[in-house]
């Protein structure tokens, strides 16, 4: 899984609007593979979505790197500039910084996610975790996702 992710990351290079300036590509591709294992479908990997489910729904996978196992109160995030992507569903994954383990957290229909999530502006400090937001985004707790 890691080798496949490294290969795809090298092939892709730095993405435009990348919050981590391309440094999260390997974790992102690992996250896509984890979501694919959990959801089924085909790995499509386009700008607008990453997976196409057997029912034709398009899924965009959002991956965060972490040093610890995720807890239900941790946030899942979608950057504001990503909300224009033509997907039906967001799926969320966390991958340990050393790539030794990953967690499929759940998913939610895009429209429902954007309605339920809290909008944060770049530079805002999230009061739930004291994190300074790096880009305008929509945050939702892991426990609010569907598994």
Pin down the residues of each PLM region.
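Nucleic-acid endonuclease domains
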Residues: 1-57, 62-147
């Amino acid at each position: 899984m890691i080798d496949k992710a490294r290969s795809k990351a090298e092939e892709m290079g730095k993405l435009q609007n990348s919050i981590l300036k391309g440094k999260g590509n390997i974790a992102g591709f690992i996250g896509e593979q984890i979501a694919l294992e959990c959801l089924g479908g085909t790995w499509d990997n386009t700008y607008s979505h990453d997976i196409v489910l057997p029912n034709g729904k398009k899924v965009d996978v959002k991956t965060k790197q972490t040093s610890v196992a995720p807890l239900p109160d941790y946030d899942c995030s979608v950057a504001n500039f990503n909300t224009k992507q033509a997907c039906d569903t967001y799926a969320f994954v966390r991958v340990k910084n050393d790539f030794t383990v990953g967690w499929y957290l759940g998913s939610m229909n895009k429209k429902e996610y954007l309605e339920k999530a809290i909008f944060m502006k770049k530079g805002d400090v999230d009061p739930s975790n004291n994190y300074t937001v790096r880009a305008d985004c929509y945050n939702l707790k892991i426990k609010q996702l569907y598994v």
